[in-house]
Design a protein with these regions (language model features):
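N-terminal domain-onset segments
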Residues: 1-38, 43, 49-51, 61-71
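Helix-rich interaction surfaces within compact, conserved domain-sized segments
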Residues: 51-93
């Protein structure tokens, strides 16, 4: 049976989030001042995979992921503090 899990994100350039294999990322939003990622998962799936998440603030430089042999998939743009802070959240593939 599928369920939706929430994963807390750090506000940092790059991080790894461990999820059940096959998790489908739905959304990233600000919740109570912190970034949260929601994904559909199968809790009975014992295998885990590491998903690489990149967060870039508006106006900040972006890493050259092509030079690393990676690509970006946009997950969300999140505004916090009434729009004073804007983060663009990607999964690196």
């Amino acid at each position: 049976m599928e369920v939706i899990w929430k994963f807390a994100l750090q506000i940092t350039d790059r991080q790894t989030v461990t999820m059940p294999v096959g998790a489908e990322i739905l959304s990233v939003q600000d919740q109570a001042g912190g970034l949260q990622l929601w994904a559909i998962v199968v809790p009975e799936e014992e295998r885990r995979e590491k998903r690489v998440i990149e967060i870039v603030g508006t106006g900040n430089p972006m890493a050259d992921v092509l030079a690393e042999g990676l690509s970006r998939f946009h997950l969300a743009t999140v505004q916090a503090r009434g729009g004073a802070l804007v983060w663009h959240v990607f999964e690196l593939l």
